[in-house]
């Protein structure tokens, strides 16, 4: 009903869907012979949003299949196929468990995940990408800042507070979220021997994490507990929150190698070269007892039944990381130069040289950006003030010997320079 009859309402327009007049709503949008108000538009958007969520690329039970999860991970993370498969299956089973928890008498246990791998190999990126795929609240916590309650540092409950903030204080949504705890190898037991001094940042933190990882109703202060002690607490059940712990575990490979050596005494003893296999190969033979020797307490290891090990990134993988993923570094810098109207090109030799420098630094993929910044810093400083630059070419000399990248000028600029001289 676009118009109502009557002398007073001759010039008044009405929403064709809900019948409200233009004076009762904030906005009335006109179409051919019909009108729609802003309230009806919002209602339609909500309906479409709900439909999109329920009819996405999902398996029969409403959860992405492991193959679908792995395929999306491939777009962002290069290599690490074993870790991707382990994560895909674990996450699929976790959310399948939530969706079918009330349909059977059999209670399915939660499977938290432990990611072990050298720095810069993709542990954090895997966790972030998983949260993006599943459209659930996600938060990251640094285990090195955590302490037992009552000591200087962050309480374990602050992790749940960050998850609540990520879900815009929607408790139900937060209770299905993902928490990634980084640097978990830094909270290992400081010593096997009992000490007079309390270990508040090592074993103490492991003990504090046990309850929220297993499942408990945590009382979370919305504004942080220490500065606002009088506020009301929110109750958050952590039973269905998926915890992913990650760490480099430097030195763990030596414990694994030592266990695998066996006896080294006698004429029949087998002599093995400790450097014959890489860190990634040794991590594949990881047993829970190795983590106990490293300094994790048995109860903490027991809360992390799914273990995914990641390997060092080789030269070919680093070159691929530079060029192929959706947010590849080369694509990012090319976009920056494109804004200046300049094409940025890297030669194949230059990309290989950058990968070699990253391997030498032992920083993995994380070190690639700092190397790129070093190479392009002077060029990015001078480029906005230069005229007629058409292309910047980064070659092997620019990476290895500190030479400036090549600047290619347009033909017009070359002719101007020739006539001026």
Swiss-Prot record:
GO biological process: cell division; proteolysis involved in protein catabolic process
CDD domains: RecA-like_ClpX
Binding site for Zn(2+): 15, 18, 37, 40
Binding residue positions for ATP: 118-125
Keywords tagged on the record: ATP-binding, Chaperone, Metal-binding, Nucleotide-binding, Zinc
Positions of the ClpX-type ZB domain: 3-56
Molecular function, one GO term: zinc ion binding
Database matches in Pfam families: AAA_2 (PF07724), ClpB_D2-small (PF10431), zf-C4_ClpX (PF06689)
Function statement: ATP-dependent specificity component of the Clp protease. It directs the protease to specific substrates. Can perform chaperone functions in the absence of ClpP.
Family assignment from sequence similarity: Belongs to the ClpX chaperone family.
Record's subunit section: Component of the ClpX-ClpP complex. Forms a hexameric ring that, in the presence of ATP, binds to fourteen ClpP subunits assembled into a disk-like structure with a central cavity, resembling the structure of eukaryotic proteasomes.
HAMAP family listed in its UniProt record: ClpX (MF_00175)
Protein's recorded name: ATP-dependent Clp protease ATP-binding subunit ClpX
Gene that produces this protein: clpX
């Amino acid at each position: 009903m676009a118009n109502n009859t009557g002398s007073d309402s001759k010039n008044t327009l009405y929403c064709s869907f809900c019948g409200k007049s233009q004076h009762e709503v904030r906005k009335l949008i006109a179409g051919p012979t019909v009108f729609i108000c802003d309230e009806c538009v919002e209602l339609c958007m909500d309906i479409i949003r709900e439909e999109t969520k329920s009819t996405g690329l999902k398996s029969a039970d409403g959860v992405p299949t492991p193959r679908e999860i792995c395929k999306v991970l491939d777009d962002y993370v290069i290599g690490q196929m074993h870790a991707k498969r382990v994560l895909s299956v674990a996450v699929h089973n976790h959310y399948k468990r939530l969706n079918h928890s009330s349909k059977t008498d059999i209670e399915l246990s939660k499977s938290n995940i432990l990611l072990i791998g050298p720095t810069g190999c993709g542990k954090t990126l895997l966790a972030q990408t998983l949260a993006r795929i599943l459209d659930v609240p996600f938060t990251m916590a640094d285990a090195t800042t955590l302490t037992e309650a009552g000591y200087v540092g962050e309480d374990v409950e602050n992790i749940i507070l960050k998850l609540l903030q990520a879900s815009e204080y929607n408790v139900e949504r937060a209770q299905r979220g993902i928490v990634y705890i980084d640097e978990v190898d830094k909270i290992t037991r400081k010593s096997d021997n009992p000490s007079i001094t309390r270990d508040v940042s090592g074993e103490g933190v492991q003990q504090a994490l046990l309850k929220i990882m297993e499942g408990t109703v945590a009382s979370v202060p919305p504004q942080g507990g220490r500065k606002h002690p009088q506020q009301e607490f929110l109750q958050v059940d952590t039973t269905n929150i998926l915890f992913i712990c990650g760490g480099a575990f430097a030195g763990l490979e030596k414990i694994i190698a030592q266990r695998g050596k066996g006896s080294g005494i006698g004429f029949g003893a087998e002599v093995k070269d400790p450097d014959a296999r890489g860190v990634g190969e040794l991590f594949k033979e990881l047993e829970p007892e190795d983590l106990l020797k490293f300094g994790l307490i048995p109860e903490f290891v027991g809360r992390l039944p799914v273990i995914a090990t990641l390997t060092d990134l080789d030269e070919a993988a680093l070159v691929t990381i530079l060029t192929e993923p959706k947010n590849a570094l080369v694509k990012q810098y090319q976009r920056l130069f494109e804004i200046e109207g300049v094409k940025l090109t890297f030669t194949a030799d230059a990309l290989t040289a950058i990968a070699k420098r990253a391997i030498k630094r032992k920083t993995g993929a994380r070190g690639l950006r700092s190397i790129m910044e070093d190479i392009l810093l002077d060029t990015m400083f001078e480029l906005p003030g230069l005229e007629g630059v058409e292309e910047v070419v980064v070659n092997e000399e620019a990476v290895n010997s500190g030479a400036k990248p090549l600047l290619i000028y347009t033909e017009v600029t070359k002719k101007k320079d020739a006539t001026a001289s």
